[in-house]
Amino acid sequence: MLFLQLPLLLVLLPGGDSEEGFQEPISFQIIWISSFYNRSWEEEVCSAWLGELQTHRREGKSDIVIYRQPWSKGNFSREDLMESEHILRMFFVRFVQAFFNHASQWKLEYPFDVQIAGGCDLYHGETSVGFVRIAYQGSDFASFQNNSWLPSPKGGTRAQLVCKLFNLYQGTLEIIHKLLSDTCPRFVLGLLDAGKADLQRQVRPEAWLSSGPNPSPGHLMLVCHVSGFYPKPIWVMWMRDEQEQPGTQQGDILPNADGTWYLRVTLDVAAGEASGLSCRVKHSSLGGQDIILYWEQHSSVGWILLAVIVPLVLLTGLAFWHRKHWKHCDPSSALHRLE
């Protein structure tokens, strides 16, 4: 019965009303990073994410969890939240203690970093897949699979020793299994339900064209800017008629301060080949009505603005010169000076 509401919630999410929207799972994960400086000094930071949206954060070793969204508690009761937070806190405390106690045996050299990512992926096919992955110094180290810890090939003998120790604690293995298979999917469903108003928000993008620094003599850098859109998935391409231009370069999708996104897409072309090119934008907020901006129109607007601005500047300068010249030649001014 747990996943009976999942298809409906998926439809409510951005992109969920299309076949493409169902291909990607909904991922929730807790990311814990610990930096071990010496035998007694360790710092840590912990955060939780629904996709790329941060929902929770805990700074240092404080027991205070910061809820980053109004709906970050999902539909869990206060008791459920306290119990889950207590279990996770105890797990991380024992995890840190194990690395301190066995640093010499595992040949760990201070300083070093350990990262844990754990959570679950929810799929449209009414399934949930839990995961826990450990990284040491940024490299794959171990993972939790089939109710036990498995070393990564990159972890070598050190990872084998760690997994051998962790697998001795059957009670802890059972708790992890329950968190991944039951607690996590229930909590995610609560988040999706409580936050559906925000998660299904649609904000239309704004797009404009500009020219960047010329990459080489005789070439132009065409730039298509798209900003203010939500959700994040978007398709932007330089086109000639209906043909995608293979030289299109897409930058990173960057966050705006208001929670929307910005993207910059460029195309390097010979100056004589810019005619007929356009930038096309597809986004779920557009309802199938793509934004199409033509480079010729951008160039025409630029020339029109130039044709208007230059005469205005010249007229303003001429008026200023006449005013200054008239002031110096004004007979009344000369009479005042004689008096």
Swiss-Prot record:
Residues 322-339 are cytoplasmic. One of its GO terms (biological process) is positive regulation of T cell mediated cytotoxicity. A D-galactosylceramide binds at F91, F92, V93, R94, F95. InterPro entries: Ig-like_dom, Ig-like_dom_sf, Ig-like_fold, Ig_C1-set, MHC_class-I_related, MHC_I-like_Ag-recog, MHC_I-like_Ag-recog_sf, MHC_I/II-like_Ag-recog. It comes from the Eukaryota. Disulfide bonds join C120-C184, C224-C279. GO terms for cellular component: endosome membrane; external side of plasma membrane; extracellular space; membrane raft. Residues 19-300 are extracellular. Heterodimer with B2M (beta-2-microglobulin). Interacts with CD74. Antigen-presenting protein that binds self and non-self lipid and glycolipid antigens and presents them to T-cell receptors on natural killer T-cells. This is T-cell surface glycoprotein CD1a. It comes from Sus scrofa (Pig).
